Amino acid sequence: MTIGVLILAKLYVVGTGPGDISKITAEALAALKKCEVIVGYTVYTDIIKKFLPNKKYVSTPMTKEKDRCLLAYKYAETENTAIICSGDAGVYGMAGLVIELKHLFKNVELTIIPGVTAALSGGALLGSPLTADFAVISLSDLLTPYELIQKRIRCAAQGDFVICIYNPSAKNAADI
């Protein structure tokens, strides 16, 4: 006999686009409107707060990603909650960590809402859309060893890929 898990509320992982509210998708905006609580990095919650002021906002500083995810899950146990990130939630966003922690919160239903990435938006803005093969590489060594970042850049360059660089102001970026 299988006993079901009671789903009390929902957690949305929402990519809010490249920073300009006009670039947020209709699906992302609809999900945010359904939520009572919006959790995110302080800079991102401040952007959304201007357009959806009647929500409860919970923010954490940079480098507190795991704490942010756990807070979002805690709120989602009783209220519809969104955890927001810039760009797409699956591209250097929060989706991976939220999924990794899901086993701790079986009674929370999880939905991931994609967003427009900075790479795609930037290409369009520059008049050089990414229409062929390309690579996206972060210069941050917080989660990826410096040597691996260098190897990825070399391999992408050897493959003649357009390379979209994320985190160009990372501490080690000048050395790469």
Q: What residues fall within each predicted segment?
A:
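A contiguous loop/helix-start segment that scaffolds small-molecule binding in enzyme catalytic cores
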Residues: G4, L11-V13, N80-T81, Q158-I176
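Class I S-adenosyl-L-methionine
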Residues: G4-L110, S121
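Loop/helix-junction capping segments adjacent to catalytic residues or to phosphate/diphosphate-binding pockets
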Residues: S22, K66, Y92, L143-Y146, ...
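Positions that flank functional sites
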Residues: I47, S138, K171
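Glycine-rich beta-alpha junction loops
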Residues: D88, D141, N167-A170
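Class I SAM-dependent methyltransferase SAM-binding "motif I" and its flanking Rossmann-like core
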Residues: V91-G159
